């Protein structure tokens, strides 16, 4: 009798398909990435600054890159690395750079080849979940780059606002 009950229970478990639990995630669209890039370019241009802006999706793939006329080629790679750093660490790169200067353990982050600890990279979140990152370079300094990235996020109502320290505003 015990054998029959155990067998029936086992057959019941095998017969019912296990339901896979899939996580619903938000993806950054090409349209959204282009709007962010355009907003960052406009914010910097309004201040007389020429930049390169790179937007990555949550997987670290480049979705959009825009470069103003005359911006040095090294800034294209710098903007990508700032975005990658913000995405990978889920941290504003200006804050990350300050932490690395203040903390010897965090200073080791500078030895990782893809990370760039300069201001201008911000993670992009929607409803509390990372959806990508933006990186700005060439705007005349880390604080200017960060301000243009922040202005782009502020112009995208579908993204969560970025709360940054106010004492470092250019």
Enumerate the predicted regions with their spans.
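Flexible, solvent-exposed loop/hinge segments and secondary-structure transition points
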Residues: 20-170
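Bacterial N-terminal signal peptides that target proteins for export
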Residues: 1-7
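N-terminal signal peptide c-region/cleavage motif recognized by signal peptidases
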Residues: 15-17
